[in-house]
């Protein structure tokens, strides 16, 4: 959503700049250039601050989920009656057992 806002702000700024260039307005006589520059700088800094604040938590959430899934599948694959995953066909035995109704695992 933030990327959409950033793209929208940049496209509006480019449209205004191109309109001003085609109508040959000079930015020195008006405050349009300064206003556009300030608006773009504020949008970019706001986007950068939010992205840096949100990405580490999202990354850690994804990493925790992957680690949890790894532990779940390691526990599922550790079975003495069927393949342990170390043999040649062990993973196929486990996969087929869970695919055809032997065990039920919900992948959260």
Swiss-Prot record:
Residues 1-23 form the signal peptide. The modification Pyrrolidone carboxylic acid (Glu) is found at residues 24, 52. The modification Pyrrolidone carboxylic acid is found at residue 66. GO terms for biological process: neuropeptide signaling pathway. Neurons R3-R14. A cluster of 12 giant neurons located on the right side of the abdominal ganglion. The keyword Secreted applies. The partial formation of pyroglutamate from N-terminal glutamic acid in peptides isolated from single cells is detected by mass spectrometry. There are indications this modification depends on a heat sensitive factor. It is found in: Secreted. Keywords: Cleavage on pair of basic residues, Neuropeptide, Pyrrolidone carboxylic acid, Secreted, Signal. One of its GO terms (cellular component) is extracellular region. HRBP is a myoactive peptide that excites Aplysia heart and enhances gut motility in vitro. This is Abdominal ganglion neuropeptide R3-14. It comes from Aplysia californica.
């Amino acid at each position: 959503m933030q990327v959409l806002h950033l793209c929208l702000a940049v496209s509006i700024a480019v449209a205004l700049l191109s309109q001003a260039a085609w109508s040959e307005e000079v930015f020195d006589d008006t405050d349009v250039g300064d206003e556009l520059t300030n608006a773009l700088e504020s949008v970019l800094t706001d986007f950068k601050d939010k992205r840096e604040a949100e990405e580490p938590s999202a990354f850690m959430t994804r990493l925790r989920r992957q680690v949890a899934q790894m532990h779940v599948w390691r526990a599922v694959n550790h079975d003495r009656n069927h393949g342990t995953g170390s043999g040649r066909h062990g993973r196929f035995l486990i996969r087929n057992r869970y695919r055809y109704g032997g065990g039920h695992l919900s992948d959260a």
